[in-house]
Amino acid sequence: MVSQSSGRQDSPVDPWEGVSDDPGNTDGLPSLLDTEHPFCPSDIRFTRHRAAWINPPCAQQQLQDASPQVLAVGNRESHTASNTKSPLGTSPLSLGDSVVETSLPKGTTDSLGSSSAWGTAGNGSDSSVTLKEERAGLPRRCPHTSLITSSKTVSGPPCPEDGRAFFKPSQLTASADADAVQVGGRTVSSNSFSPEAFVLPVDAEKENAHFYVADMIISVMEKMKCNILSQQHTETWSTEEAGRSLGNSRADLEGTFYTHVKQESGSSTSSDSGYEGCVLQVSPVVETPTFSEVTEEDCKCDFDDFVIVELGDFSNTTEPCGCSSDTSKSVIHEPNFNSAELIAKELYRVFRKCWMLAEVHYQLTGSLDAAGSIVINEERVQKDFESSTDVVQEIKLKSRIRGTGDWAPPRFQIIFDIHPPLKRDLVVIAQNFFCAGCGTPIEPKFVKRLRYCEYLGKYFCDCCHSYSESCIPARILRMWDFRKYYVSNFSKRLLDHIWHEPIFNLLHVSHGLYTKAKELDRVREIQEQLFHIKKLLKTCRFAESTLKEFEQLPGHLTEALHLFSLEDMVKVKKGLLAPLLKDILKASLEHVASCELCQGKGFICEFCRSTAVIFPFQTATCRRCSACRACFHKQCFQSSKCPRCARITARRRLLESLPSAAT
């Protein structure tokens, strides 16, 4: 690094860094004995934080190996060897600071090495320094100092050989990531980090699974924040200013992304996620962004902070700047749009696109320095992605968030089958000698200590099975067996959770249970009567007191047929549910018999023409037509000659014949 003196022409160029012959002056600063160069109190070397000067030992060793050797030729002026500095000596910026390394062309390297000449005030030959600066890592605080992080071209006039002292470095190495420059017959590689430092542990994917999901969620949230900020800037700024800022930032975006890819090519693994190639995290910029750079930061948010892809089409993800204020594209209008499985699939699909595009962009940026250009067919990438295997299968193969390939925790599911009795050894072998609850490996000599769960049909360790007892739904539905069996802690929590839930429809699950359990069949008959009479009472304005009686029962017993919970079936077995249903039915029948509104809503049997009013809830003596839902006596009803169905058919034919007669 070279700093240019802009104050006086007679003052020689005072570089930042140098190598001194004085062993006491090892910090690379100008000698305190040199009174011609005043001390700059705002020098960035003194104002920068101390922690920024620390480099890893491998980087220090690399810089020490790359230190050039200084050749001193003559000394006829007042400058002594202690005041003479080499441009690439030991300094806080060279040894202690992790400065971003930048590739320099060969011509630039030669010019930089030849321009480090020292002139005298008597001859008046000042070194002219031409700086081409693309970006500055830190703001300038001192007029004598500058920090340049990109390529520089330094040229100086030829120094006459009449005794002037000059310093010429024998080597100058500047590389970025995997590049190496061969200078002075020696090849120096800047990638001195060992490959073992980036090798993940064997179980890193399993241990960091929650980080994997957390990074996905955080990335999507950061994308939403970026969209909101971009929308706010668009509303406040004018169209011309926004267009000018976007036009200026597009070129900077390409250069910045190229620099970031080169810097991160050695270590593309996120330090906290445990998986490779998913997130490119870059240290934040120190300088305060100006008004014209806000739009640039918004457009570069996908590359500076995290690689985030919008939940849209594949074509939208191929754009270099993925910032968009339209967040409605990521909204999925489906019945189960917020389910965990669907969200995981969507996140995996989007991030898989992101990984593929990251590789494409890396090849594109690498082709800028290559002799031949690399042609990337993005249509082929899209076709390969669409023709890949199912997303669900890829999730199972690449990352099993629920356990491992040999073990998975039990699922929250209702089991309606009774497990056949099997030998303990066979069941444990089927479990791969793992505890079904926590996945703890079990040695063969401790197999006898495992505890069996009657609900799941698997063996658990002592920590996952505390000998809790519960009724098994499959045994109740198949055998009307209410005995309690030992279940695991997981099964106990599951059964307690569904204990009051009406999820068992006996008509579909176990229709033959009514013939096995007589008390259940009697409850079904009363339930059917209450189902019809409750509908009638809801239409009567005088049945408020009677409807309050139904509040003693769960709503599903009087509003749906054949629907029970485990608690209801236990009450049926104990004989507690049938008496309660009979009391409510008795009160309802008394109201219907004495209410004129309810009597007016009854039916008259059209077969026997009896004056007695009949109702659908009288299931013992009445029957309803399945087509017109009319009510008749059971002994009088004939489905093939329903009078109401005949009238409806005749009326329909009459209506169909009227338009044809009018025409």
UniProtKB/Swiss-Prot annotation:
Positions carrying N6-acetyllysine: 484, 534, 574, 634
Protein name: Protein associated with UVRAG as autophagy enhancer
A GO cellular component annotation in the UniProt record: autophagosome membrane
Function: Regulator of autophagy that promotes autophagosome maturation by facilitating the biogenesis of phosphatidylinositol 3-phosphate (PtdIns(3)P) in late steps of autophagy. Acts by antagonizing RUBCN, thereby stimulating phosphatidylinositol 3-kinase activity of the PI3K/PI3KC3 complex. Following anchorage to the autophagosomal SNARE STX17, promotes the recruitment of PI3K/PI3KC3 and HOPS complexes to the autophagosome to regulate the fusion specificity of autophagosomes with late endosomes/lysosomes.
Molecular function GO terms recorded: phosphatidylinositol phosphate binding; phosphatidylinositol-3-phosphate binding; phosphatidylinositol-4-phosphate binding; phosphatidylinositol-5-phosphate binding
Membrane topology: Peripheral membrane protein
Biological process (GO), any one: regulation of glycogen metabolic process
Keyword Lipid metabolism: yes
Coiled coil (UniProt feature): none
InterPro entries reported in the protein's UniProt record: Autophagy_HostDef_Reg, RH_dom, RUBC_PIKBD
Keywords: Acetylation, Autophagy, Cytoplasmic vesicle, Lipid metabolism, Lipid-binding, Membrane
Region span, Disordered: 1-36, 65-136
Region (Interaction with UVRAG): 196-235
Quaternary context: Interacts with UVRAG; the interaction is direct and promotes association with the PI3K/PI3KC3 and HOPS complexes. Interacts with STX17.
Reported modifications of this chain: Acetylated by KAT5/TIP60 under autophagy induction, promoting autophagosome maturation and lipid metabolism. Lys-484 and Lys-574 constitute the key sites for tuning function in autophagy.
Pfam families: RH_dom, RUBC_PIKBD
Segments of skewed composition (Polar residues): 80-93, 105-130
Location within or outside the cell: Cytoplasmic vesicle, Autophagosome membrane
Annotated SMART domains: DUF4206 (SM01175)
Main location: membrane
Keyword Acetylation: yes
